[in-house]
UniProtKB/Swiss-Prot annotation:
This is Putative oxidoreductase YgfK. Binds 1 [4Fe-4S] cluster. [4Fe-4S] cluster binds at C938, C941, C944, C948. One of its GO terms (molecular function) is oxidoreductase activity. Pfam families: Fer4_20 (PF14691), Pyr_redox_2 (PF07992). The lineage of its organism: Bacteria, Pseudomonadati, Pseudomonadota, Gammaproteobacteria, Enterobacterales.
Amino acid sequence: MGDIMRPIPFEELLTRIFDEYQQQRSIFGIPEQQFYSPVKGKTVSVFGETCATPVGPAAGPHTQLAQNIVTSWLTGGRFIELKTVQILDRLELEKPCIDAEDECFNTEWSTEFTLLKAWDEYLKAWFALHLLEAMFQPSDSGKSFIFNMSVGYNLEGIKQPPMQQFIDNMMDASDHPKFAQYRDTLNKLLQDDAFLARHGLQEKRESLQALPARIPTSMVHGVTLSTMHGCPPHEIEAICRYMLEEKGLNTFVKLNPTLLGYARVREILDVCGFGYIGLKEESFDHDLKLTQALEMLERLMALAKEKSLGFGVKLTNTLGTINNKGALPGEEMYMSGRALFPLSINVAAVLSRAFDGKLPISYSGGASQLTIRDIFDTGIRPITMATDLLKPGGYLRLSACMRELEGSDAWGLDHVDVERLNRLAADALTMEYTQKHWKPEERIEVAEDLPLTDCYVAPCVTACAIKQDIPEYIRLLGEHRYADALELIYQRNALPAITGHICDHQCQYNCTRLDYDSALNIRELKKVALEKGWDEYKQRWHKPAGSGSRHPVAVIGAGPAGLAAGYFLARAGHPVTLFEREANAGGVVKNIIPQFRIPAELIQHDIDFVAAHGVKFEYGCSPDLTIEQLKNQGFHYVLIATGTDKNSGVKLAGDNQNVWKSLPFLREYNKGTALKLGKHVVVVGAGNTAMDCARAALRVPGVEKATIVYRRSLQEMPAWREEYEEALHDGVEFRFLNNPERFDADGTLTLRVMSLGEPDEKGRRRPVETNETVTLLVDSLITAIGEQQDTEALNAMGVPLDKNGWPDVDHNGETRLTDVFMIGDVQRGPSSIVAAVGTARRATDAILSRENIRSHQNDKYWNNVNPAEIYQRKGDISITLVNSDDRDAFVAQEAARCLECNYVCSKCVDVCPNRANVSIAVPGFQNRFQTLHLDAYCNECGNCAQFCPWNGKPYKDKITVFSLAQDFDNSSNPGFLVEDCRVRVRLNNQSWVLNIDSKGQFNNVPPELNDMCRIISHVHQHHHYLLGRVEV
């Protein structure tokens, strides 16, 4: 029910593992081809125990359930740090408890199970791993993995009988009846010849049947001590002594990043761009100090040596922070992940210098594929992870980390290389990965509700104004099918040369790779398709045959929207004429956008190809052209694409006349007019046009300085981030929270200093005047605000306007006048080029539908996608990226990075530590795979909701498989519960009881349940292991 996890009985666990393996060649969603096989001959030793890999899951969400531990092992984790236990084992935690959007915050502590249940989960996993290892990776040298116990939080609690029983049973379970029970269960399974034959294990029969007797009764020889933030030094030392002296356990003690002191921690976070993370200085006052730690560690190392045991430190604990995000409950939350790395690695350097590299370090602070090689090469081991495994790719990131380590020459190091660690600690403060800007702030999202079925979607496509087939054309490029890729692009994009240069690429802000490393350079790939595919595409292209039955179309305006409309309609056989008042086509792209942003020949390329489709151009047309005139000339459809060619300007006091409006200025600049602007130019506004004006002004002879003045802050600035960065690169200066009031003849520009108030209707904080002013000495002023339609001209043209003076149009851009459409910026104000093309597509789609032309998009099926191939990419992070200058290497790299999310998404499956979301192939749906939620496995941590691109929560909104009647009754999720020959079903808060036969077939299914019952039948027939028993 909800956040109550239900453990899987051991026998059922084995059934789940091997039935899924037989059915799907996967275990807990990990495909067989991605089971990690350690490199032979490379091992590490941790206090005398051998480990085939130095990596594994940290004590946390990935080691709470048996299936989590199994999944960690399958993907390369061999040092398994079990989730922390404590005497208070019946705490109720508020949910959600994890926020892993970037750096991770959590509000969870120890295991959510009782001590007995936690021990039982670890025991199940202990047996399961021995079996899996014997089946898939047999070895004569014994087990390849280490279980490490994690306990907390004070000595009094640890000495309580339940904790003593837990620790003792972890150290030796020989007298516990569960150990004998599970050994008998395993023995029975391995004596079953049918089981061995089904999985091709007959040749291993002898060794497998001897396995149960060989499984050690001691699960752990080591412990990691976890103490609360603020635990007194004497208490920490006392617990360590107890573990060494009384329990005889090799011991790691977990220390806090607060050892660096408040000032240093604050400095590091601020330098790396994480200044918004709130800290309480008094928390540092209560924590262990460095001098105290050094003295304590020296005493404990001596004690361990005396007892012939191992002792070291676990670095580091999470960092206690103020809960100022509002995503999690409570006043405090605990930070981990990449923001923790520079802190933890600097703690490691401080301690290693003090102990000359002889202090063993178990590491966990911000380890990832981008840092693990550097950490390992210093001699630090083992290395455990939690935050990185909560990101898309999930457990597969462990495998990726191991592949990074396979080539290391540091496997034989038996101490910490202090010099190397010092260099890493210094580098950690400046490396890209630890800087906040490394991950853009944009959230990958689809602005629609999460559907019950068919939820696989490529967010790059949904973000695109023309819904370009991005994953498909990237795959074609990767296969060197450049002309095919370009043909696919042309299906939806009339202007690939233009949009290959100046598209606002919303696709890249919604690329799933942002949750891994960086977005694909999609716009550059479009450019490559045109460069490499054009010649072949043009050879096989045929001019569309015009049809005498098609109605003629007039388009007023030959800018991007007009060109696109002409292309789409002419391609479908319509006679199209574009009427343009200028002497050329291209509109704002040709005449306003500076040519340093896009070469003129590329603009002409798109114009020429539109003309090649038979589109006619009439230049120098009267601005007084009306809809009625065009209708009288025989045009059935009229599309208006006149753009936004008016500037409202800025009202200023003063008598300086050296004031330009942005559009006239850029038009004159593009003509090559000899402009006299003086030395210092100020541009008012902070949109893309303002960036163009400032960059253009700097290229005018005599101009030495260009300053953009904006009345809001950087965060509210409407310009695309890319345009802002280009302006900075060119040397443009910025003055935020300044608003011009007066421009005097002597060049004095008076600016009112502003502050930010409450958000406006667009979510931007309103600028509020202060009593302060500043002055600048300025030669010319350019106003780049208030671009809008010429509503007077529209009214004269005969366009109906609404009460606010905007064109009154429907979703397709059609006005109240039948067959008259508004497209491009004139429809709703200035936007991007691709958005203008998008409005043209919607209008032309409506026209073609009205003309009974089914579609102007080819139905050719471009990709026979192999999901296994895509899944291979899921755990990988690109350590280095090649430059786009090397076209072949760049295309190969980006094609390999594309996750093709509309074919294989399953992010909610990846990121769930408990494996509570599953993807199964179900025939008869649009998507090959459907996502189900397993109620029994879920604790509602909220992580799947964080990374799902839809507006929704998979653990609440997807079809839920219930295992217990009480959980079904206490939930509102859509889902089902199979009870022998009947199924209880819930959808939209309505419930049904249906009969199901032994073959999984229903009778009399209500129409609204067709999809759900098809899935239920498929699960019943092919994935019955998902319906297995659970413990109450």
